[in-house]
Each structure stands twice: as structure tokens, then as C-alpha cells.
């Protein structure tokens, strides 16, 4: 599976997170880990 860097950015919530995610993993599932 390919690997992607996924950035979750929300200035309102003060969130700026970069996670590694595979294309066979749902983004929400990866963010919860």
C-alpha cells in the first residue's frame, strides 16, 4: 500500500497534526489512533 502524509488543520480548534496514512486505511480511523 502507498503511504501518504495527511495533515489535519483546524485553526478554530487549534489542531495542526500530520499523520502517516496508508491508502487502504480510512482517514478517520487513522486519526483516532
UniProtKB/Swiss-Prot annotation:
Cofactor(s) needed by this chain: [2Fe-2S] cluster
Source superkingdom: Eukaryota
Annotated GO MF terms: 2 iron, 2 sulfur cluster binding; metal ion binding
Cofactor: how bound: Binds 1 [2Fe-2S] cluster.
Localisation: Plastid, Chloroplast
Function: Ferredoxins are iron-sulfur proteins that transfer electrons in a wide variety of metabolic reactions.
Protein family membership: Belongs to the 2Fe2S plant-type ferredoxin family.
Protein name per its UniProtKB record: Ferredoxin
Amino acid at each position: 500500500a502507498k503511504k501518504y502524509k495527511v495533515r489535519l488543520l483546524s485553526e478554530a480548534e487549534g489542531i495542526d497534526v500530520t499523520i502517516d496514512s496508508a491508502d487502504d486505511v480510512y482517514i478517520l480511523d487513522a486519526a483516532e489512533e
